[in-house]
Amino acid sequence: MRPESHMHPRGRPPWDEERRAALEKVISSLVGLSSRDLIIVEGLKDSNSLRRLGVKAEIITTNSARRVMRLERDDRLLARDVKIVLLPDFDREGREKIRRWKSELSGGRAIDMTTWRVLRSLLKSEGIGIEGLARIAGKLGLLRKEMWLDPDEMIRRARFR
């Protein structure tokens, strides 16, 4: 029998190891972003969930296209080594936002939409969005008491903005 920490938060059958490992890999890549990198999310709950995981990248919350357009003119985006990750919600509106954000921000820069696609494939059927990412990580034993458990390094405290 699997440990209880691998149970789905709603008491459904446990996540299989392959799916759990895929989620762990995505979370690890988010935690591994530098403070120069940017993550764009829709709301404050999304941002707070990422901070609970220990994400150090700058997180920009926006529900408005105007904020994204202002961001397009931001000097930080001129640097080619800045990674930009788009993480809107997984609903139809989120799919529209990710396309719009990508076209408004790309300007020859690489925009990471793969992280969103992988998270959507892992979480959408469970009714979990970006705002629930830290919660599911905790339920699966990847996060304990505001600490991200990275198998390759020491436990470190998550930083809140």
Annotate the PLM regions:
Residues K45, R52-V55:
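N-terminal G-site helix/loop of the GST-like fold
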Residues R2-R10, R52-L53, T62-R161:
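TOPRIM fold recognition
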Residues G43-L44, A65:
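Alpha-helix N-cap/helix-start capping motif
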Residues M1-R36, L44-N48, R70-E72:
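Phosphate-handling DNA/RNA-contact segment within nucleic-acid enzymes
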Residues V41-G43, D89:
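Small/polar loops that bind or transfer phosphate-bearing groups
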Residues L33-I39, A57, K83-I84:
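Short active-site oxyanion
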